[in-house]
Amino acid sequence: MILKKKVAGLTENALRNFVLRARRAVGVRGQVNVLVTGSAAVRSLNRQFRRQNKPTDVLSFPFVSSLSDPRQSAKVAGDVAISADIARQNAFCLGHSALEEVKILALHGILHLAGFDHERDNGQMARKEARLRQLLGLPAGLIERAHPENRRSSKVRRATGARRTA
C-alpha cells in the first residue's frame, strides 16, 4: 500500500486491512497493491496504459506473468491506482467520507482484477459490487447510482450531500 496523497482517516495499515477483507469477499487470492495518489499521476497512468488523456477515479492493472510457473501468477493479482482528489469529489457529491470513497474505489478495482467489466456485463459487476459494499459496510458509490436497479432507497445518499436516513 502506498499513500502518496493523504486522505482523512486513512492509514496504510487500515487500507491494507480493508483490501484483505475485500479480496476475500471477492475471492481474489493473489496480493493486491494499492496506490492512492493525485489526479495528475492517475491521469498519466490512464494516458500511458489506456490512451485516455484524462484523470479517472480508479485504474486496475491485472498481473500477467510471462513466466511458465503458474504459481507466480497466483501470488499477485495486480495493482490498483486511486485518485485521492477524485475520491474526495465523489465523496462530497455522494454525501459520505473520502475514506469510505477510497474503500469503495479499492473494492471496484479489486472486482476488475477478478475479471469483472461493468462496461460489458449488463450490470453484473454493479450488482456484485452493491452486495459486497453492503457486506463490507460501505455506502452507495457511483456505480450504484449509474445502475438504479441496485439502489436501496433507505441507504442511498443523494448527490446533494443529504445524509443517509437508515
Regions found by a protein language model. Name each.
Residues 1-102, 111-166:
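An acidic/histidine-cluster motif and surrounding catalytic segment
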